[in-house]
């Protein structure tokens, strides 16, 4: 779920904190990708006749197809992804997980009714609501990534928190996820829509946390309290306090405790046994890997291993998998070229007009030297 309404709130009150870019803008960048979010997207989107792709044994393969081709697409644009997998959910998330189970049970009933009535659109809609990322999905994707030569990290707890830790440690440029709570966990840069289907033609949204703080006039601790008021996975919120009211209260009173002391509790009743302090602690000091000592290595793909797994076990087209493996090897050879800003630190600023002129000249030179790389098409397997 992330944080209720946070993206819209930032767009309304701190629009300069959001930039929109094409995928080509991230050439040479290392990015920590929320693996569970990606796999969920693939299970929803990679379908044939409304159903998830399967092999002859009836095993789902949508997640593998999505992971294979979307990862290749990133590599073709010079992006070096590292995937971060969820660990155990925090105890505080048990309430949210219980609600999800209830919604899934309700969707099962609605699906059954839709099937009896022959309502094709509703059948597809409720089928998607039943999608859940399983341990098997995760393990198969880890095996695939290893064969592709792509690093992955097992987070001890929430993947978004470990993504944020990798960004803060300077191991990667940004965290890529649709969950806005990556910002609450403190990632300096968040990318949304990086792994979205090419067909959707969505620009990549880049959020800068320090600019959010600057434009709203709050610090990280106050931002965490704001997110708790908006609504998170970890505790209830105060009913009746919407996004604009929440931001005004945080600006005025700084903390949830001070807000409680200064609002009409009859009009805005506090949830019983409210765990806002525990939620704050979870966001400010999450359980994460030691990012400073974590080494990320991108290696040569194992073409024969990929064929054995994806074709021998999962029955994908051998021609397509071998073609993908060759793209992996080619992009591995070309991945040593980095970005200029990896070697030089910016000590001053230039005007937006001059910056555009510099970028324009740079892109012209790059095109004349290397030629354009065609965007990787998202292909169907099998």
UniProtKB/Swiss-Prot annotation:
Comment on bound cofactor: Binds 2 magnesium ions per subunit. They probably participate in the reaction catalyzed by the enzyme. May bind an additional third magnesium ion after substrate binding.
Positions that bind Mg(2+) 1: 34, 86, 158, 160
Stretches the record annotates as N-domain: 1-104
Binding site for Mg(2+) 2: 179, 181, 233
E.C. number(s) listed in UniProt: 3.1.-.-
Classification via Pfam families: XPG_I (PF00867), XPG_N (PF00752)
UniProt-annotated binding residues for DNA: 47, 70, 158, 231, 233
GO terms of biological process kind: base-excision repair; DNA replication; DNA replication, removal of RNA primer
GO CC annotations, alphabetized: mitochondrion; nucleolus; nucleoplasm; nucleus
Residue span of region Disordered: 352-382
Cofactor(s) annotated in UniProt: Mg(2+)
Post-translational modification: Phosphorylated. Phosphorylation upon DNA damage induces relocalization to the nuclear plasma.
Full protein name: Flap endonuclease 1-B
